[in-house]
């Protein structure tokens, strides 16, 4: 027998699925309520159903977690979140799953004894990000699904936080929380629980003028589902405490079937018996649901075509697993004496309750038989209880109306239910006041000219732009900074070193040494794209030299304040808020993107490797959709810089939008947002094109000229995300 604390965590998109999960052996269930969950199109729970589910879970010694794992707008957080959570908190909700750090800090302040689980949407990829969340009050982390067992084990050994990972179900092509594809394509934001799954659509792929020979239904980004039965012991031994099944959009039968199979094998492992997976169980899971087969996920491989379905063909069999309702055994003692009240005593799990009913009558004629009384008392219906034994003590010739027996039984069961859940309930709390803002600062008059910063991914583009007028500062990746940094340049322009979009593994020594040297010689700080990079820089004493990129979401003022208290220099305006929503946001420490190709996805998968083979070179592939729009896919083979890290170990793809984002015609509206600064981001542009675009925006924003008429998308600036 293995002495381990484990948890089998199942999904429920409806109350029926919740019952199916509990009945099949789940230790805990995660659900979405009427709002703020990352599966907005699941049936989800009403308030009454959710409170009942919390109570039912506690009766059976199970736990229930509520998803609040979306990004919230100011009015939602300020006006709705407290009242939304309060009844569930009072009912004894075990934890909330959270993505938004503004929501995180709000819950920590208003519900201090409510556990917070950091969602996989936070894109936690390493130990320092995990420690940062631990310091802020998280009790559990759901790291990025892309992490290997080796990475997870290292995190577990160095932090006391619980680790939860996915063991079965759908895989996103993008790092969770780093996907804007559905949002940009059709306004349905994955960060709001409304993903339309454009990664499951057909795309043709070209690279170096070569087209991959897939058919018209070839889905270049569609991953197989994950199934980890064969490596479950490895996952547990790496330090994963909670084994999470994906599938809140699935039917109760799926939840019951998958949960039951994993319960069987988790118990097998914990019992100390030889661990062996039966082929019939693998087939059973595929019959429940399959998307081109299954894979083991990223636990023991970094990427590869073996993980890809390359199709969106979903299959589910006609299997209907038994959905079992579990019952708690109760012990009862019924006392019936003439001219005395009916007395029913019930005991369950150390709790004893007593109910008294109407008066027992003396039977003048035919006395009531015990069998008839027992039949009536054993009618427990759809309750959470079943009789283990019921002693009936009859003193003399008695008669009791059936109505009286029913009433005393219902009263006793109601008392018992309340006794079992009462210890889990919490007292009411009052909403804590939000911090008063400096209204003069939030609504200061903005001058016509704001500082303009330029981000350059390509060294040749940076070379052309370095001597252009009107630029306050530059954001450079390592290779570009290494090539062009000088104390003289740092004296004339603010220089910031950009971190990789995804931070995994050890930060290369050369990167750290060079960054420290450049700081000593005048470099201002860092443009940070992820929590891990920030946490590492903060640990080194550089937290107050960090600028947050748009991928570090600050949708609401609570999140702005969270980072302001951290001391960061500024944040980047979120790309999914519209102009009207931005007017209700504190932008005084924010930088607005004026131009750039929006990253739609960051993926550990590689289009080039999967379809053409890996060359280890920075190259660009192109996806073409059914409307003939082409989306550049940049292969970031050396995220830290060339020759300073193990090549391709933690490389990634960035999929950009087909049309660049640009606001040359929105100068008057931009001026009303009370911003700190503006940014132009150059990624894949040729040097001369970048120079021409810079000139256009300089003409409009600094010289009061007219836009050139180039084609841009305004993204969400006008429409916003759902």
Question: Predicted segment positions?
Answer:
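Surface-exposed amphipathic alpha-helical tracts and adjacent flexible/coil segments at the periphery
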Residues: 1-24, 28-40, 47, 51-55, ...
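Conserved phosphate-binding/catalytic loop of the ribokinase/pfkB sugar-kinase fold
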Residues: 122, 126
């Amino acid at each position: 027998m293995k002495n381990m604390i484990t948890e089998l965590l199942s999904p429920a998109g409806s109350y029926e699925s919740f019952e199916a999960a509990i009945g099949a052996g789940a230790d805990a269930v995660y659900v979405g309520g009427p709002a703020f969950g990352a599966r907005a199109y699941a049936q989800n729970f009403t308030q009454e159903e959710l409170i009942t589910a919390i109570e039912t879970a506690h009766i059976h010694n199970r736990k229930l977690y509520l998803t609040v794992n979306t990004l919230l707008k100011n009015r939602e957080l300020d006006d709705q979140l407290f009242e939304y959570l309060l009844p569930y908190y009072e009912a004894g909700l075990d934890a909330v799953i959270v993505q938004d750090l503004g929501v995180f800090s709000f819950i920590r302040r208003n519900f201090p004894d409510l556990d917070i689980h950091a969602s996989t949407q936070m894109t936690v990829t390493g130990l320092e990000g995990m420690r940062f969340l631990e310091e802020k009050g998280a009790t559990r982390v759901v790291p990025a699904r892309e992490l290997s067992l080796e990475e997870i084990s290292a995190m577990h050994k160095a932090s006391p936080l619980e680790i939860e990972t996915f063991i079965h179900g759908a895989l996103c092509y993008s790092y969770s929380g780093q996907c804007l594809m559905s949002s940009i394509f059709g306004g349905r934001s994955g960060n709001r629980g409304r993903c339309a799954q454009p990664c499951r659509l057909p795309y043709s792929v070209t690279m170096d003028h070569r087209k991959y020979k897939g058919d018209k239904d070839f889905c270049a980004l569609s991953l197989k589902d994950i199934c980890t039965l064969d490596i479950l012991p490895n996952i547990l031994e790496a330090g994963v405490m909670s084994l999470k099944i994906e599938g809140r959009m699935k039917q109760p039968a799926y939840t019951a079937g998958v949960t039951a199979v994993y319960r069987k094998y988790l118990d097998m492992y914990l019992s100390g018996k030889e661990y062996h997976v039966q082929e019939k169980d693998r087939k059973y899971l595929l019959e429940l649901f399959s998307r081109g087969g299954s894979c083991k996920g990223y636990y023991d491989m970094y990427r590869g075509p073996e993980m890809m379905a390359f199709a969106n063909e979903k299959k589910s069999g006609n299997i209907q697993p038994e959905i079992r309702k579990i019952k708690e055994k109760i012990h009862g003692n019924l006392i019936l004496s003439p001219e005395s009240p009916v007395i029913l005593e019930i005991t369950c799990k150390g709790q004893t309750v007593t109910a008294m009913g109407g008066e027992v009558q003396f039977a003048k004629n035919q006395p009531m038989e015990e069998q008839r009384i027992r039949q009536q008392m054993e009618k427990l219906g759809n309750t959470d209880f079943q009789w283990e034994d019921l002693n009936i003590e009859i003193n003399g010739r008695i008669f009791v109306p059936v109505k009286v027996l029913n009433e005393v039984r219902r009263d006793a069961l109601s008392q018992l239910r309340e006794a079992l859940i009462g210890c889990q309930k919490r007292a009411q709390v009052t909403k804590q006041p939000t911090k008063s803002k400096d209204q003069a600062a939030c609504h200061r008059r903005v001058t016509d000219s704001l500082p303009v910063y330029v981000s350059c991914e390509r060294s040749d583009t940076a070379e052309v732009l370095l001597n252009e007028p009107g630029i306050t500062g530059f954001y450079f990746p390592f290779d570009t900074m290494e090539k062009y940094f000088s104390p003289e340049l740092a004296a004339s322009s603010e220089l910031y070193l950009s971190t990789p979009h995804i931070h995994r593994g050890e930060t290369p020594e050369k990167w750290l040494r060079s960054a420290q040297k450049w700081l000593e010689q005048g470099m201002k700080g860092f443009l940070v794209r992820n929590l891990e990079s920030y946490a590492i820089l903060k640990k080194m004493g550089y937290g107050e030299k960090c600028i947050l990129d748009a991928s570090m979401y600050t949708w609401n003022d609570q999140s702005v304040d969270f980072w302001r208290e951290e001391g960061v220099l500024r944040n980047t305006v979120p790309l999914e808020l519209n102009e009207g929503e931005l007017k209700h946001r504190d932008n005084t420490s924010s930088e607005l993107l004026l131009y750039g190709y929006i990253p739609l996805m960051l993926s550990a998968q590689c289009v080039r490797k999967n379809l053409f083979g890996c060359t280890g070179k920075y190259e660009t592939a192109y996806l073409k959709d059914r409307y003939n729009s082409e989306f550049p896919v940049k292969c970031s083979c050396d995220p830290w810089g060339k020759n300073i890290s193990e090549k391709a170990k933690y490389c990634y793809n960035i999929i950009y939008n087909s049309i660049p984002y640009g606001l040359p015609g929105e100068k008057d509206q931009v001026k009303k947002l009370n911003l700190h600064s503006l940014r132009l981001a150059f990624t894949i542009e040729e040097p001369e094109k970048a120079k021409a675009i810079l000139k256009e925006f300089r003409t409009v924003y600094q010289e009061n000229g007219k836009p050139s008429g180039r084609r841009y998308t305004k993204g969400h600036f006008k429409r916003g995300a759902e």
